[in-house]
């Protein structure tokens, strides 16, 4: 049935009962469903992932903390230890990824809080905690020389407080040291034992060279459960080229300063039973007086070859106890024959002059004798180790890793006195 009604000139058609008008009061949405803000915030927070994973323990110290936003964009990330020590990082330009910049602190808990924003200004936070490992031991390093003017043969000596035995740790630690100098020169690294790493130039250092060594061992995996700790900075300058050539066959020592001959000293070297070591020695240290005792070299004091006395103007050139020093008892033999226990004997006047001239790292080059250099002796090992056994590097900024070599440590205590 259809009814027609006229009302003010407007015709309205009224449908039979089975038909009805579409609703105009609550129209149905035609777009995507509307998600409440609380639900969106929860979804944003759930889309944030952390590495290390939440609740992780024994986290390695050389890793990086990474936060990813799989929905929305990261607007801030705050990472701190439980003692409020901050861990800084970098947020990508896309806002999708944050990564920490530095190593982690050992044996402590971290809290990482990420803020992420989505559409329509909705923001959410997500938090994760983890704990780093506690090292079996921490490894530190010292650098020598530091704050000194040294001779042209002086190596850079890095000593660790624990044995570094794994190839991976030895390779990785090289990336922790930066060596800069002006101008750059060819150089090389060499491990002489498990605790001692040296660097020297291929040839003697240029006169006037200024060298800076810095390191950051934090986050270095030193192997066997040990981790590096601490930073170092050392600076030194290369002085004039002091080179003394001691000829055991002629009993004369020629001393030059930057290539200019300044003195020739008659001397007496080690006799047949106690020959002086050949090779390029470096001055290890100087002492105005040394109490020399023969028992330090296995010679009983009360034997015919024994001695126990104060010796003056001592320039130390080997671990085995060789010095250039004053020897008034052998003046008659100096320039004529070798009668010492291995040291280079000078007259008191010449010894005083040489003592005043010498500095750590100077060259004392011994030639003409029968005794070869001992490669484990700090006095000769740097310049008597063939250059092919060093890993070449340009002495400037970073160095490539060295060949891994393990040799018995050369002990320098207690001191030995050849006389």
Show the residue positions of the predicted features.
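Surface-exposed, flexible loop/turn segments at secondary-structure boundaries
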Residues: 85, 219, 261, 351, ...
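Conserved beta-strand and immediately adjacent loop positions that scaffold enzyme active sites
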Residues: 113, 176, 252, 313-314, ...
């Amino acid at each position: 049935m259809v009814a027609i009604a006229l009302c003010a000139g407007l015709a309205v058609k009224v449908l039979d009962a089975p038909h009805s008008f579409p609703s105009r009061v609550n129209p149905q949405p035609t777009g995507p469903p509307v998600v409440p803000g609380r639900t969106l915030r929860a979804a944003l927070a759930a889309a944030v992932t952390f590495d290390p994973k939440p609740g992780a323990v024994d986290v390695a110290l050389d890793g990086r903390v990474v936060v990813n936003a799989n929905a929305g964009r990261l607007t801030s990330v705050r990472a701190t230890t439980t003692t409020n020590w901050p861990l800084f990082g970098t947020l990508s330009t896309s806002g999708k990824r944050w990564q920490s910049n530095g190593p982690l602190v050992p044996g402590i808990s971290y809290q990482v809080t990420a803020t992420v924003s989505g559409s329509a200004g909705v923001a959410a936070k997500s938090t994760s905690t983890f704990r780093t490992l506690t090292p079996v031991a921490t490894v530190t390093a010292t650098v020598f020389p530091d704050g000194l003017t040294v001779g042209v043969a002086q190596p850079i000596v890095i000593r660790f407080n624990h044995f570094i035995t794994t190839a991976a740790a030895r390779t990785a630690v090289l990336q922790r040291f930066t060596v800069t100098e002006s101008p750059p020169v060819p150089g090389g690294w060499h491990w002489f034992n498990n605790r001692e790493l040296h660097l020297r130039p291929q040839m003697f250092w240029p006169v006037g060279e200024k060298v800076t060594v810095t390191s950051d061992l934090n986050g270095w995996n030193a192997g066997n459960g040990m981790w590096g700790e601490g930073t170092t900075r050392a600076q030194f300058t290369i002085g004039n080229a002091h080179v003394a050539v001691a000829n055991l066959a002629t009993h004369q020592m020629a001393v030059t300063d930057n290539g200019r001959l300044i003195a020739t000293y008659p001397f007496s070297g080690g006799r047949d039973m106690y020959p002086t070591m050949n090779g390029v020695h470096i001055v290890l240290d100087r002492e105005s007086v040394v109490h020399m005792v023969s028992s330090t070299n296995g010679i009983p004091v009360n034997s015919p070859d024994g001695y126990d006395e104060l010796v003056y103007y001592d320039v130390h050139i080997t671990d085995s106890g060789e010095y250039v020093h004053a020897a008034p008892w052998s003046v008659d033999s100096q320039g004529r024959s070798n009668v010492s226990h291995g040291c280079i004997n000078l007259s008191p006047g010449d010894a005083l002059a040489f003592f005043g001239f010498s500095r750590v790292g100077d060259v004392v080059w011994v030639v003409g004798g029968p005794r070869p250099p001992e490669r484990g002796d700090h006095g000769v090992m740097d310049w008597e180790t063939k250059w092919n056994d060093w890993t070449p590097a340009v002495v400037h900024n970073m160095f490539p890793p060295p060949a891994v070599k393990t040799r018995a440590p050369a002990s320098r205590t207690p001191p030995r006195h050849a006389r």
